Amino acid sequence: MWIIYAIGSAFFAGITSILAKCGISKTDSDVATAIRTVVVLVFSWILVLLTGTISGITDIGGKTLLFLVLSGIATGASWLCYFKALQNGNVNKVVPIDKSSTILTILLALIFFHEGLSLAKIGCVCMIGLGTMLMINRKEDVKSNTSDKSWLIYAILSAVFASLTSILGKIGISGIDSNLGTAIRTSVVLVMAWLMVFVKNKQSEIKSIDIKELLFIILSGFATGASWICFYRALQDGPASVVVPIDKL
């Protein structure tokens, strides 16, 4: 069953990238991230209420809560870097780099969870790495300045934080319902995202957001919420070294 959830996560994650790109053509990436996080948070807590798992919040241990918070911080950092990269670079180049976090996740899962390493996994890691390089070099970016490589730095940081998110999240949801865990960590992401907006004094830009872009940002939030719920349900039941590669398809 976890394989189905992992496939669902990959599907919604793919939609998220396209919708998000459409929503940040003119809108600042930090502001867009903060707004879509609100949508994800509402989506997550509604699901918790509908499934009746909110009662489990009193049973959460200190270790579980710590790793959920750390996972949320890593997610927030990954998001901020990812959407900054999308804003400055070509989606066809940014997304493959972000997806390459699979390689690091497999290695970290091997170290921390002792999930084992087979020839098949080694082959997959090599193919993912090769495929990433080919996709990055496949198309020239005709929209952005080719001399500006800041998107590359942000994309790499996004991949690193995304990998940490998977590992920390795997530990954090080991003892609680995955939907509740997703809602809690999304709350952390929300705080982090809005702090970034206010620290950079960008809150005034919210009023000037184009309605069409706002719609795409909201839709990307729903897609993200669906992807997260599927991902952490799959991660709770399946091995991280297999779930993450499926999610990154």
Which residue ranges define each predicted feature?
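Hydrophobic/aromatic residues within transmembrane alpha-helices
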Residues: 23, 32, 85, 111-113, ...
